């Protein structure tokens, strides 16, 4: 039997079945034919390339494998992604950053049967991946070029790092507010620069999109927090619960702000929740999943109010004073808002709303609101 035929038979036996017996039979075929290894790797690279054509990106693939399978499969898919990359078409800077973040640990050495079983489990998952909304540029379209980080972003990142590190709630609150203020001003500056490059009040720039992981537990509350951060920074977000991410649409500077701020606020929220639980236990009250869900829901609700207020105040100040004082500012911002909405509606013509479940613990809500009032609004390293 040829090597290619061995792999074909193994795939026919295992990939279109869900049972362990089929998996064992197929793994035995592959284990008995060492010459099939190269063909098996080539087929895996083809599965990865197919995932790219169906709208998936490197971070998405790693995320779904980590969510559905085990660490060995994460290492395997990471190796496939790296092996396929030299054969891929040119991509943008966000894609390149995701490739850089792909885990680089080699899969563990096991016996041939166990290895074949793990490979087939991974390929089963890759084969069943549905199409996602395409976020990157179409082949042949002008590519977005990577830009050096601006001084404003570097300053925001430093503020957020301080906010996460401080043990003083009042300091964290002040740092967070300052970070959101700087984000809003940076967004205004970027909008005006783009419009002036075109010589009109309508920016020539176009909205981009990225996916940000929304990991368990308490995904609903985290998705609400991400939506609040996106809204405060002139972006829109749509949560995909089954695959554990939200798609955020906006202009590049605003997407960077959302990634940084959401990551930082999540760190601050989880730190504050741990402290609040310790305080409740010291008072003799047992804390539960409901407490944590209520805490994070209240945190997201209150953070949304604070972020929106800080962003609106900074934008209003920029419109009236300083280098951003420009008659074109309001038309520019309005045109960008329309562009974001249109891109969001093209990507997601049908969306639904969902009610936040499990928010019934008054102590959790109170503690979460207090923690959001104390949160810093600064930035960290972006999620890709």
Segments predicted by a language model, with ranges:
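Intrinsically disordered, low-complexity linker/loop segments enriched in Gly/Pro
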Residues: 143-165, 173
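Extended, helix-rich structural scaffolds rather than catalytic motifs
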Residues: 1-148, 188-384
